[in-house]
Design a protein with these regions (language model features):
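DNA major-groove recognition helix of helix-turn-helix/homeodomain DNA-binding modules
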Residues: 43-57
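A short, Lys/Arg-rich alpha-helix, primarily the initiator
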Residues: 1-14, 18
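DNA major-groove recognition helix of helix-turn-helix
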Residues: 9, 34, 43, 62
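Recognition helix of helix-turn-helix/homeodomain-like DNA-binding domains
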Residues: 24-39
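Alpha-helical residues within the helix-turn-helix
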Residues: 10, 21, 49
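Residue-level signal for the short linker/turn that defines the boundary of a DNA-recognition helix
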Residues: 13-14, 39-42
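Key DNA-contacting residues within the recognition helix of helix-turn-helix
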Residues: 6, 31-32, 59
């Protein structure tokens, strides 16, 4: 769903398990949230801090790019 999130995760060499641990959730929960796009505000802020990226970039969707 979020190609930039996927790209940053890959660029930093983080697995889904790594990401889940950084957010304090299970790997299955992280994968579900990534697929559905339903991160909490707290989780989204933490991901932006982790990758030093703005929210609009990290969570851009295909629809946003049109």
């Amino acid at each position: 769903m979020f190609k930039n999130l996927d790209a940053e995760q890959a660029r930093h060499g983080f697995t889904n398990l790594d990401m889940a641990q950084k957010l304090g959730i299970s790997r299955v929960s992280y994968e579900s949230k990534k697929k559905s796009g339903k991160f909490t505000t707290f989780e989204a802020k933490n991901l932006c801090r982790l990758f030093n990226c703005k929210f609009d970039y990290l969570f851009a969707t295909e629809e946003d790019r049109r």
